[in-house]
Amino acid sequence: MRLLPLGLFDKVKLGGTPMATNPNRWRTIDIVIASIIAVAFGVIFWAWGLLWNGPADAIPLPGRAVLYGMWLVPAVLGALIVRKPGAAFYTLTLASLVSVAIGTSWGWTLVVQGPLEALGAEVVFAAFAYKRYNLPTALLAGTAAGIVAAVYDAVVWYPETSWTSMRLPYIAITAVSALVIAGLGSVLLVRALAQTGVLDRFAAGRSRALV
């Protein structure tokens, strides 16, 4: 008896009628790669927090916000690689939870802030119906996540400070940092990874001309 190829029933219906594959459905490899990115950046977040509260403490606020974009990279990076609804939200939220588990100085507040920042990026990709994964979209997603993060900080962490001398400049600097580090940085990282071939199972890897 001849065995049918593995996965055949995922592609055909009874009678041989082709069944369309849902492009928005997450594959196992999507979950795995998004989780790997999240765990890796959860550790990076912890180290970045040491930098923020250590050597970088010499840079007064709002200037120190130039470093903020690193905390938003997983949202843009995860979305650019996985290219599925929820990728930005899943990757950054999980990265935030990992950093909480490791022992970040901001503790459980990140359980709320992480998903909010992730939603900022997710909304941008959703606005383009999850079909645009180019440089402008990545820059917008990074900036949106940065604005959400900075507004949260301004309201929760710095409520007593002046809007003109502290909070508005802080929001602006954070947005620019997110645009450059999370937006442009993620694009460059995906390009570098694609050239190695490690992303060949993803659209981001098969299209060498990504973004």
Named regions from a protein language model:
Residues 193-211:
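Short, highly charged, low-complexity non-transmembrane loops/tails of multi-pass membrane proteins
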Residues 62-121:
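Alpha-helical membrane segments and adjacent membrane-interface helices in multi-pass membrane proteins
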Residues 6, 16, 20-78:
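Hydrophobic transmembrane alpha-helices
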Residues 127-131, 180-197:
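Membrane-water interface at the C-terminal end of transmembrane alpha helices
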Residues 53-61, 129-133, 195-198:
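Membrane interface segments of multi-pass transport proteins and intramembrane proteases
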Residues 34-38, 112-157, 187:
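Short helix-perturbing small/polar motifs within transmembrane alpha-helices
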Residues 43-67, 100-111, 150-173:
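Membrane interfacial helix motifs at helix-loop boundaries and amphipathic/re-entrant anchors
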Residues 31-36, 69, 73, 85-93, ...:
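Hydrophobic alpha-helical transmembrane segments
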